[in-house]
Regions:
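A solvent-exposed, acidic/Ser-Thr-rich amphipathic alpha-helical stretch
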Residues: 195-223
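Active-site-adjacent scaffolding segments
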Residues: 1-30, 34-36, 40-174, 179, ...
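A short glycine-/small-residue-rich loop at the edge of a beta-strand within enzyme catalytic domains
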Residues: 164-168, 180, 207-215
Length: 223
């Protein structure tokens, strides 16, 4: 198998890692492309291509996230993660972790973490990497990575609701919400929204958007 063929085989995994670290499809695609350039230019073939490329895309994504956060501080309006409509990477053994980690709620929780914490959390909690692999990927000792994982988990848990809704119940409510939204059913939307719901808008840093969050079921339902 050529390098190009091996890379294409692993591209879905690499993109999925980058996306969960960055929260942006375009930035994840750029990180994957940079990973390919570094792999193509490498003078030797790594023993484990998967481990090598996973480490490279992780390091690239950390660097991109650090610079992206500086840009986001100057962002016009409120920056929100970019939804991923279809995840190209599938692993039956980690389907629940993969599905949960691309929800908007999960991506917003990951915004609470430093770039290193986020990378360690993604590799460990979402993809099930061992600490030796994670240490190699982020350039830290295994002990340091374990500490980063503990801190990341604590920050994420602090941001989670006290009670998790059943997955099927969430899917049913989401379906009812989108049906009401599509049909312009204001009363139906109001019934589904909590009294203290907040609506935040993201205009991509360019397009007109909400000047501030809208609070309250009645107001949000009528937007």
């Amino acid at each position: 198998m050529t390098r190009a063929e091996e890379f294409e085989r692993l591209r879905p995994l690499l993109f999925s890692i980058a996306y969960r670290i960055l929260g942006s499809v375009s930035e994840a695609e750029d990180a994957v492309q940079e990973t390919w350039l570094r792999y193509a230019a490498s003078p030797t073939q790594p023993t484990s291509t998967k481990a090598f490329l996973s480490a490279v895309v992780t390091r690239v994504s950390i660097d991109v996230l650090r610079s992206a956060r500086v840009r986001r501080e100057k962002y016009v309006g409120q920056w929100l993660p970019e939804p991923l409509l279809t995840d190209p990477y599938q692993d039956p053994e980690r389907s629940a972790e993969l599905a949960d980690s691309v929800s908007m709620a999960a991506l917003l929780l990951l915004e609470r973490l430093t770039p290193l914490e986020r990378a360690v959390f993604v590799l460990r909690e979402v993809f099930g990497f061992g600490f030796p692999e994670i240490a190699s990927a982020v350039g830290r000792s295994e002990a340091a990575c374990r500490q980063l994982a503990v801190r990341a988990r604590r920050h994420v848990d602090e941001g989670r609701p006290r009670f998790e809704a059943d997955r099927r119940e969430r899917e049913e409510l989401a379906g009812r919400f989108f049906d009401a939204f599509r049909e312009g059913d204001v009363d139906g939307l109001r019934e589904l929204l909590s009294a203290d719901v907040q609506l935040a808008g993201d205009g991509g840093g360019k397009a007109p958007q909400l000047a501030r969050s809208i609070i309250g079921a009645e107001k949000v339902a009528r937007v």
